[in-house]
Structures are given as structure tokens and as C-alpha cells.
Swiss-Prot record:
GO terms for molecular function: structural constituent of ribosome. Belongs to the bacterial ribosomal protein bL33 family. The gene is rpmG2. This is Large ribosomal subunit protein bL33B. The lineage of its organism: Bacteria, Bacillati, Bacillota, Bacilli, Lactobacillales. GO terms for biological process: translation. InterPro entries: Ribosomal_bL33, Ribosomal_bL33_sf, Ribosomal_zn-bd. It comes from Streptococcus pneumoniae (strain ATCC BAA-255 / R6). GO terms for cellular component: cytoplasm; ribonucleoprotein complex; ribosome. HAMAP family: Ribosomal_bL33.
Length: 50
């Protein structure tokens, strides 16, 4: 199956700072990663958005 684009949005401010490619298969949970948010100026949880 083809890869799909998804964004990682900051859980605090909601800005979409990162884009990733994921497999097209639906998953029950969304990806959560700790990454640096340039708008908040600190490391926060980023969640997958579609």
C-alpha cells in the first residue's frame, strides 16, 4: 500500500511543525513523539494528525 502524509501537531499550542510519511493501513492509535516545538520553545508531545 502507498505511503500517506501526516503531520505532527504540538499538543500545547497546536502548531503543525513536522510532517511524516506513514503506511496507509489504519491504526487504532495515533503516533505520539516528544519533539522540540519552535513556537513553545521547549520539548512537548507531538501527536499525529491527518
Amino acid at each position: 500500500m502507498a505511503l500517506k502524509k501526516a503531520s505532527l501537531a504540538c499538543a500545547v499550542c497546536g502548531s503543525r511543525n513536522y510532517s511524516i510519511k506513514i503506511s496507509g493501513n489504519p491504526k487504532p492509535t495515533r503516533l505520539e513523539v516528544n519533539k522540540f516545538c519552535k513556537h513553545c520553545g521547549k520539548y512537548t508531545t507531538h501527536r499525529e494528525t491527518r
